[in-house]
Amino acid sequence: MKKLEVFGAAKLKGQIRISGSKNASLPILAATLLSNKKISLANLPRVKDIETMILLLKSLGSIIEDNKKELIIKNTKQTKTFAAYSLVKTMRAGILVLGPLLAKFGKAKVSLPGGCAIGTRPVDIHLQALSKLGVKYKIIQGYVHANAPKGLIGANIKFPKVSVGATENLIIAACLAKGKTTLSNCAIEPEIKDLVNFLINMGCNIKWTAKRTVRIEGVNNLKELDYSVMPDRIEAGTYLIAAALTEGNLKITGIDPKIISTEINILKKVGSKITLKKNEILIQGSKKIKNINIKTSPYPGFPTDLQAQMMVLLCKANKRSHIKEEIFENRFMHVAELNRMGAKISINGNQASIEGNIKFEAAELMATDLRASVSLILAALAAKGKSVINRIYHLDRGYEDIEKKLKKVGAKIKRIN
């Protein structure tokens, strides 16, 4: 099994270009199932979850050509509606093929999803909303068996709580439904806006009518499309935190600062000096890190996908900080490993109390999920000596060329068997 060796105490300095967004690419790839026309996608990150989604599309009959610069997808012979557990088990985004399969064929058998073990992530919201479009479903032996005998029919749907995945699935499904669908209490993450932009460019009729309300009118014909996926704001936030943690000096390029304004404002509050330019962020980490209290929440709030990384930074703050996790109920599994490195973090329900002024100690560590794995890399970068991180297959699900990018800005990091 592969591991990472990280030698700490280096100040990161240089430039990092941000890759395409994993969380935008996955629903866009699923949405290509709606069309029989050629679709070309550029700026896809080369990470494991994307590879898995490509394999899933191929298993459904998509013909896919990869020339490394772009992915060319044709669904002219795509007739299969069965998404197997063997492909869906490693990523929760597998459930996103349910909506387009039902929209196109009126039936689907899709395995319940896997991914990081950071909460139950129920698909009930997806299924209850799809039922309002005319879908009948049963869950049998870990599979969703769904069909729409009369096809999908537009409806007014209010999500009981904000859900990124359910918003994506329903927007995609409604694009081919009969009549109009109005979805309210939608998630409004930039990745969802990117999905909607992709769908509109493909010929779908979608309009935001309020901050969290979207109206979709079903269409019969879609167009060929060349599309470039947005940059990854979570990757950008991770490297900004790495700079703040190591007193580094980084230029982050290829991303609009507006989409991570919440994260930028928090980093300014803890002491980092940040300069914003068009598609560039310059950050200078401070020797003195100020404490702060944070809670995760749906966009435009602080993202749960940066909670673990931010926790590492707050271990170096001048006083105690608190983080309240309000998205997932089991997202503090990195705490035990950070405490083994000298952190003093205590958990009470969904709140973490983080003592400041910590000096991290190098250690052998075990990653538990995607974002936890990168938080351990950050802690190792701030520690003296050599740390070894096990189970880095989690990392490969979501970060493109992370060792290469970190090496380029001065980190001592290498992959070993």
Swiss-Prot record:
One of its GO terms (biological process) is peptidoglycan biosynthetic process. Phosphoenolpyruvate binds at K22, N23. The active site is at C116 (proton donor). Pathway: Cell wall biogenesis; peptidoglycan biosynthesis. It catalyses: phosphoenolpyruvate + UDP-N-acetyl-alpha-D-glucosamine = UDP-N-acetyl-3-O-(1-carboxyvinyl)-alpha-D-glucosamine + phosphate. Its EC number is 2.5.1.7. Pfam families: EPSP_synthase (PF00275). It comes from the Bacteria. UDP-N-acetyl-alpha-D-glucosamine binds at R92, K161, V162, S163, V164, D305, I327. One of its GO terms (cellular component) is cytoplasm. SUPFAM superfamilies: EPT/RTPC-like. GO terms for molecular function: UDP-N-acetylglucosamine 1-carboxyvinyltransferase activity. It is found in: Cytoplasm. Keywords: Cell cycle, Cell division, Cell shape, Cell wall biogenesis/degradation, Cytoplasm, Peptidoglycan synthesis, Pyruvate, Transferase. The modification 2-(S-cysteinyl)pyruvic acid O-phosphothioketal is found at C116. HAMAP family: MurA. Cell wall formation. Adds enolpyruvyl to UDP-N-acetylglucosamine. PANTHER family: UDP-N-ACETYLGLUCOSAMINE 1-CARBOXYVINYLTRANSFERASE. Belongs to the EPSP synthase family. MurA subfamily. NCBIfam families: murA, PRK09369.1. This is UDP-N-acetylglucosamine 1-carboxyvinyltransferase.
